[in-house]
A protein has these predicted regions:
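Mid-length scaffold segments of soluble, non-membrane domains
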Residues: 58-105
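Helix-rich interaction surfaces within compact, conserved domain-sized segments
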Residues: 99-160
Length: 160
């Protein structure tokens, strides 16, 4: 409870994105469109993904429209690190992934997801419910600030 009170008193980080309807849609249907890329709110499925780091190779084993699950995570107070290694060389990609993992570990991975997104024009975009921050280059300090300010800042922060 103390964390929720502290988070409510702290200013949110990142750019504000207008919050869309949070209604549930049937799994397998396209939950979009969304008003940002990646999404920060909107229609979604009634279930979510587990916290953790998803690699590009994981995408083939995931259900269609992963955004439908991930927006539900955002509604539960998650922060998502959306990354695109296609805009980096191999060494840059590994540095980005290592930096993301390190920040996630600092927060014990609680309510944190890293997820690849090919549509990004920058290497990293972090989102929370109604908030978005783009990174032209990884900045661990900025990433930590985003997590501290925005994790649990959502309609259902106490949900798992």
């Amino acid at each position: 409870m103390g964390l929720l009170v502290w988070n409510g008193a702290q200013a949110a980080a990142g750019k504000e994105v207008p919050v869309l309807s949070a209604s549930h849609v049937e799994k397998g249907t396209n939950p979009g469109p969304y008003n940002s890329d990646p999404p920060t709110s909107g229609q979604h499925y009634a279930s979510e993904f587990e916290a953790g780091f998803f690699n590009e190779a994981d995408l083939t084993s995931l259900p269609a429209y992963p955004e439908g699950y991930l927006v539900h995570n955002l509604e539960h107070g998650y922060v998502i690190f959306w990354y695109n290694c296609a805009v980096l060389d191999e060494a840059g990609c590994e540095q980005l992934k290592t930096g993301i993992r390190d920040v996630m570990e600092e927060f014990d991975g609680v309510k944190l997801i890293a997820f690849p997104r090919a549509s990004l024009q920058v290497p990293l975009v972090m989102t929370s419910w109604g908030r978005l921050q783009e990174f032209g280059a990884f900045d661990a300090g900025q990433a930590r600030r985003f997590v501290r300010a925005n994790r649990y800042r959502a309609p259902e922060p106490a949900a798992p």
